[in-house]
Amino acid sequence: DRLMLLCPPQHGKSRITSERFPAYILGQEPTRDVVSASATAQLGEKFGREVRNCISSQEYRNLFPDTQLAEDSQAKGLWNTNHGGGYYAVGIGGALMGRGGELGIIDDPFATWEDAQSELVREKGWDWYTGTFYNRIRPGGSIIVIQHRMHEDDLVGRLLQQQAAGGDRWEVVELPATLEDPPWPERYDRAALERIKQISGNRKWSALYLQNPTPDDGTFFLREWFELFDPKKIPACHKYTTGDFAVTDDGGDFTEIATHGYGGDTLYLALDGWFGQKTADVWIEHTIDQFAR
């Protein structure tokens, strides 16, 4: 009765789970109440409108003739069925007084990447989940959490930590957008995903598309280990230059050249660096320049 659906952005998870699944459930059991929560109330109302319009369609009536909308309750974010069930949309942090349900859906608990990086926003969302949303799911009810990962301490991260400590057991459906096997190649083929990866950067790509968030400090290196130094006062050290060379110009792989300093077990210096998609004559000049400096 606990499901996580972790997918990359724009891969249809909301369409299936937040817009079509509630309509299906109410077609099967029109006495049920559904609570749908999203990062903003506007997004929740959008999902509610889609579910409502689906139930109003002739195609739906052909499949589920006994489930109809109550004539006196058809607002996009709050409506009932003719059998007493209904749908209520709320933003994360919103009030649920007097509202509850047998099915609770949380779809995209963070509005932006920046929100997910904020400890304050994450804490408020968690307090709302544990203190408001969770308590409105009736005994025997189900919870579905839909999102793409944004932080190792996001809602899914905390729920999985809670599970490890003996909390609710979650069925996790994870769909990483690997380049070798794109989950929706008709929309996002390998070339499209590679462009997204290049623009997003490693940390966003790992979280949003691979569902594998990494700490802001990194997995292997902590920010607190690094300090700035005055380039005019370089400590005594051994200097060496390394390079990863390519031969294409304005395309293909990058050439990276870096000069480092080593002054013992606790002193490693990044002294100089350059990268570019250039031919050999160009990066040779940059390498010589670093030697000279």
Regions found by a protein language model. Give the residues of each.
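Gly/Thr-rich phosphate-binding beta-strand-loop-beta motif of the actin/hexokinase/Hsp70
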Residues: I234-Y262
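Walker A/P-loop
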Residues: R2-F21
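ASCE P-loop NTPase helicase motor core
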Residues: Q117-P182
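Nucleic-acid-processing active sites and adjacent nucleic-acid-binding tracks
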Residues: A258-R293
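Post-Walker A helix-loop "phosphate-sensing" segment adjacent to the P-loop in P-loop NTPases
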Residues: Y24-D33, S56-Y60
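Conserved nucleotide-state-sensing and coupling region of NTP-binding domains
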Residues: A37-G93
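Conserved RecA-like ASCE ATPase "motif II neighborhood" in helicase/translocase motors
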Residues: K76-T132
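ATPase catalytic-site recognition across NTP-hydrolyzing enzymes
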Residues: D181-G243
